[in-house]
């Protein structure tokens, strides 16, 4: 379990952190800045973003085991199916609902930014759990 957390968590963090940069800055950066206007920062606070992603990956890594144990016993779900559902749920709750909807409500963020960003983070959550599941399968031994 220790290797799963350390190696799986580190690799997942690196992939997801960099994918977030590619999506939010390289692919959609101009669109986000146009839509967000005055509420967008000129320079990102990367240490805060990295800390948030470290916590995010750690939470997913810890709770994937619990969620999979339950889903396997109750619904006979595979690890892959569990990872997709669990990851999408965490992605939506973590950033889509809690972050995105509150930002829309408090920062004059356009609703379309909430929709695009929340959709991305829901998919990102599923990908995070899928990557973790590969390491879980290898180091913990799930079928």
What are these regions (language model features)?
Residues 1-143:
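Juxtamembrane/disordered regions of integral membrane proteins
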């Amino acid at each position: 379990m220790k290797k799963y957390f350390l190696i799986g968590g580190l690799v997942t963090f690196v992939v997801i952190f960099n994918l977030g940069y590619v999506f939010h800055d390289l692919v959609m950066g101009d669109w986000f800045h146009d839509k967000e206007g005055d509420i967008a920062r000129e320079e990102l606070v990367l240490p805060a973003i990295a800390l948030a992603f470290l916590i995010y990956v750690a939470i997913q890594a810890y709770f994937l085991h619990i969620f999979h144990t339950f889903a396997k016993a109750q619904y006979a779900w595979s690890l892959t199916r569990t990872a997709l559902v669990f990851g999408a749920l965490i992605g939506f709750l973590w950033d889509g609902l809690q972050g995105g909807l509150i930002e829309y409500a408090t920062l004059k963020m356009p609703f379309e930014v909430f929709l695009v960003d929340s959709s991305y983070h829901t998919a990102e959550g599923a990908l995070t759990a899928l990557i973790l599941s590969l390491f879980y399968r290898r180091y913990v031994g799930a079928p």
